[in-house]
A protein has these predicted regions:
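Catalytic Walker B motif of ABC-type/P-loop ATPase nucleotide-binding domains
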Residues: 39-42
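Conserved ABC ATPase "signature" region
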Residues: 2-9
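A short, surface-exposed alpha-helical micro-motif characterized by mixed small hydrophobic
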Residues: 81-83
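A short, proline-enriched helix->beta-strand linker immediately N-terminal to the Walker B motif
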Residues: 33-37
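Conserved ABC ATPase signature
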Residues: 14-18, 22
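Helical segment within the ABC ATPase nucleotide-binding domain
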Residues: 54-66
C-alpha cells in the first residue's frame, strides 16, 4: 500500500527519518491496508506546509477514486475542505449548524457560518 501513497522507497526507513508529510502518508497506507469502505481523516493537513497540504489533499481524492471509499474529513482548514469535499458540515456548539454542498457554504447567509469562513468568529 506504500505505492498507493507515493512512498514505495521508504519501507526501510525509521520513523525519525520521515518528514511530516511522509508520516501522514504512512498513516494513510496503514489505514487502507485493511481495504476499508470509509476512511476518517482527523486534521490531515495540520502542521504541513502548503506543498505537502496539496499533496495530501490530492492523495485523499485519488484514494476516493481508486479505492472507491467514502472519506470523512475533520478539519479547520476550509480550503482543504473545499478541495476534497462534495459536502461539508459545520459543527457549532456540539450541533450541526449547516450541512450541504460546497457551493452552499461559499454563498451562505448564515451569520455563524459566514463568521467561521471569514475568520471572524469569536471564541467562546
Amino acid at each position: 500500500k506504500l505505492g498507493l501513497v507515493g512512498l514505495e522507497d521508504v519501507e526501510d526507513k525509521k520513523p525519525a527519518e520521515l518528514s511530516g508529510g511522509m508520516k501522514k502518508r504512512v498513516g494513510l497506507a496503514r489505514a487502507i491496508a485493511i481495504e476499508p469502505e470509509v476512511i476518517l481523516y482527523d486534521e490531515p493537513t495540520t502542521g504541513l506546509d502548503p506543498t505537502n497540504s496539496r499533496r495530501i489533499n490530492s492523495l485523499i481524492k485519488e484514494l476516493q477514486r481508486v479505492l472507491k471509499v467514502t472519506s470523512i474529513v475533520v478539519t479547520h482548514d476550509i480550503e482543504s475542505a473545499y478541495e476534497v469535499s462534495d459536502r461539508i458540515a459545520l459543527i457549532y456548539e456540539g450541533r450541526i449548524k449547516k450541512a450541504g454542498a460546497v457551493k452552499d457554504f461559499k454563498s451562505t447567509d448564515d451569520e455563524v457560518v459566514a463568521d467561521f469562513l471569514n475568520g471572524t468568529m469569536e471564541s467562546a
